[in-house]
Amino acid sequence: MGKAALQDPHGGIWYFAYGSNLRLSVLENRGIKALDIKAVIVPSHYLTFDIFGIPYAEPSFASVAPFAREKKTTLRLGDSPASRDVPPVQGLAYLLNPRDYRQLVISEGGGVAYDEVEVHASILDKDGKPDPGATLIARTLQAKYPWRPNGAPSARYLGLISTGCKQNEPLTAYSDYIDSLPAYEPPTSLHAKVGGLLFLMFWRPPLRLLIRLIRVNTDQDGHCPQWLGWIILTLYGLMWSYHDNIHSKIWGRGDGRKLHFEETPAKEVPVRH
């Protein structure tokens, strides 16, 4: 699904947050005020980190992906053969007015890396259990170009998600899963630090310029022009290609331990709605 149409301008829009927006302060710092907040679970999707970021700083960002029908989704870390089951994603549903929802889409990249999709969410009670009779339909953001395997998110970014869960009682058990995920650790050797610094000094300025261009070139739904999106994707592609094939060979990698979300056939898989 591509971008979704906004609701009636006089009505609210439920937005499902699963990443750094779980911290209400992050949302408020973007000038967005929630009219209502519900802790929810989305049984049809799971949390991923398949949005490309910047090596040596923020290698990846959160997204969601749908569970495949009649298959089991597991997570394997790095080169380890061991895997574990992946739980449905949990987070917060924020009720936003159309203006704030548009601002949120702009703050998340103006539709360059994400598609807007609708999900069915079950509201959680204070013990973190879903209430079958309490559901809502929410908009959320899903990777437009999923990056597999996932790079590890930074400790800073993963910490925002973990703290956001811990600040909301129904999500405290889910925070244990978040805390078990690996985080990217910046290089510690002088050689690797110099390599990371040189990389960021070269690539960050043009990326910041493009982010500013997104904020001033968006339509009524918060999306940037197609030509600008193409430029941004091309620059990120060049940056990661240079990292993988040249820079990392000299200075070491800047994306941490890989997260492999894998789907395997299962004889009996619970139906997810």
Swiss-Prot record:
One GO term (biological process): gliotoxin biosynthetic process
EC top class, as a word: lyase
Main location: membrane
EC identifiers of the protein: 4.3.2.9
Keyword Membrane: yes
Phenotype when the gene is knocked out: Impairs gliotoxin biosynthesis and accumulates ergothioneine. Also leads to attenuated gliT abundance.
Protein's cellular compartments: Membrane
Pathway, per record: Mycotoxin biosynthesis
Membrane topology type: Single-pass membrane protein
GO MF term list: gamma-glutamylcyclotransferase activity
GO cellular component terms listed in the entry, alphabetical order: membrane
Segments passing through the bilayer: 227-243
Sequence similarity: Belongs to the class-I pyridoxal-phosphate-dependent aminotransferase family.
Role this protein plays: Gamma-glutamyl cyclotransferase-like protein; part of the gene cluster that mediates the biosynthesis of gliotoxin, a member of the epipolythiodioxopiperazine (ETP) class of toxins characterized by a disulfide bridged cyclic dipeptide. The first step in gliotoxin biosynthesis is the condensation of serine and phenylalanine to form the cyclo-L-phenylalanyl-L-serine diketopiperazine (DKP) by the NRPS gliP.
Name assigned to this protein: Gamma-glutamyl cyclotransferase gliK
Native source organism of the sequence: Aspergillus fumigatus (strain ATCC MYA-4609 / CBS 101355 / FGSC A1100 / Af293) (Neosartorya fumigata)
Taxonomic lineage from the root: Eukaryota, Fungi, Dikarya, Ascomycota, Pezizomycotina
Protein's gene: gliK
